[in-house]
A protein has these predicted regions:
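HhH-family (HhH-GPD) DNA N-glycosylase catalytic core used in base-excision repair
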Residues: 1-326
Length: 326
């Protein structure tokens, strides 16, 4: 019985907490180089692929996500256990290529849908450009950078928690805190590509019983994390069928430790709200102070793209890399 159970866990990529990695095990769990399935993800040009990669690179989750100069990779659960996918420039014009390892046709539809959201591939740049035309300064930015898109996330739950952990700390330390959270509550698994032991991002139920004292953040943020986990566990919050915008914000703002910036940012990246605008963001406030004539309400319901444009303008003015996250 123990032998069969252990084999089942290994097939799923899950290992017992007491398991130890070695080189032989790593090789045994590594997946072959060729993907099981690849599909093209078309988009309407223009599209700034480099800008999208730079954002994902800066905020990749330790061990679960990786970004190089040509693409983005992520570990995911598939119908065959633990797998991963990669998004890179496609062979066809105006497309990205999605490749999935250790997965089948039944996985590609779900991963494809998520990837399209993450990389904002269904946005119509002509519609966004027309909206930006309502404000002269925003339109001037958009004319210089017509391929900007809103970077979304794989999971709204991840976005909520990493955003809370990232409050008033550097981006790099925010990633460290995310790693600590994953180790505190996430399931141990074999990385399907290299066989290394990793921790998956914990689900809501795992976080409700996890010891969060090992995460070097404030007690108020730990409380916020538990509160959000409860809202997800009881079905109040979900990202496939999100609450209406006003109700979503009301629910988020009802959690102690979540303010206007967090609620708007989570709505934009985690719940795919094209009209979200984190007005209290430092960079956005600086840009609106420099350009007092700007009225982002002119471009509704596309204010998320106004935020992207202003973040880009701020980076240009400061001579810093583009990164729509503070």
């Amino acid at each position: 019985m123990i032998s069969k159970l252990s084999s089942r866990k290994e097939h799923l990529g899950v290992v017992a907490p007491s398991a130890h990695a070695d080189k032989t095990a790593a090789k045994r769990h590594a997946v072959r180089n060729a993907p099981d399935v690849s599909v093209e993800l078309p988009y309407k040009a223009p599209y700034d692929w480099g800008a999208m990669l730079s954002v994902f690179r800066a905020h990749q989750l330790p061990h679960l996500e990786s970004v190089d100069d040509r693409g983005y990779e992520r570990v995911v659960r598939t119908s065959q256990g633990m797998g991963w996918f990669r998004v890179a420039e496609g062979a066809k014009e105006h497309s990205l290529q999605l490749s999935v390892w250790n997965g089948g046709e039944e996985d590609i539809a779900n991963i494809s849908q998520s990837a399209r959201r993450m990389f904002d591939l269904d946005a119509d740049p002509d519609v966004v450009r027309e909206a930006m035309n309502a404000d002269p300064y925003l339109f001037s930015i958009w004319k210089r950078h017509p391929g900007l898109r809103v970077t979304r996330s794989w999971s709204g739950f991840e976005t909520m928690l990493t955003t809370i952990l990232g409050q008033v700390v550097s981006v790099s330390f925010g990633r460290t805190l995310a790693d600590e959270l994953m180790k505190a509550g996430g399931t141990k698994a074999r990385h399907p590509k290299n066989g290394e032991l990793i921790h998956l991002f914990p689900n809501a139920e795992q976080l409700l019983t996890a010891d969060l004292s090992v995460v070097r953040t404030s007690e108020s943020r730990r409380t916020a994390i538990r509160s959000l986990a409860m809202l997800v566990a009881d079905g109040t919050l979900e990202w496939e069928h999100p609450l209406p915008p006003k109700e979503l914000r009301k629910t988020l703002l009802g959690v102690p430790g979540i303010g206007a910036w967090t609620a708007e940012y989570v709505a934009m990246r985690g719940f795919h709200d094209d009209d979200a605008f984190p007005a209290t963001d430092y960079a956005l406030k600086q840009e609106l102070k420099r350009h007092a004539e700007v009225d982002v309400n002119r471009v509704r319901p596309w204010r998320a793209y106004a935020a992207i444009a202003l973040w880009k303008s701020y980076a240009e003015a400061k001579g810093t890399p583009y990164d729509p996250v503070v």
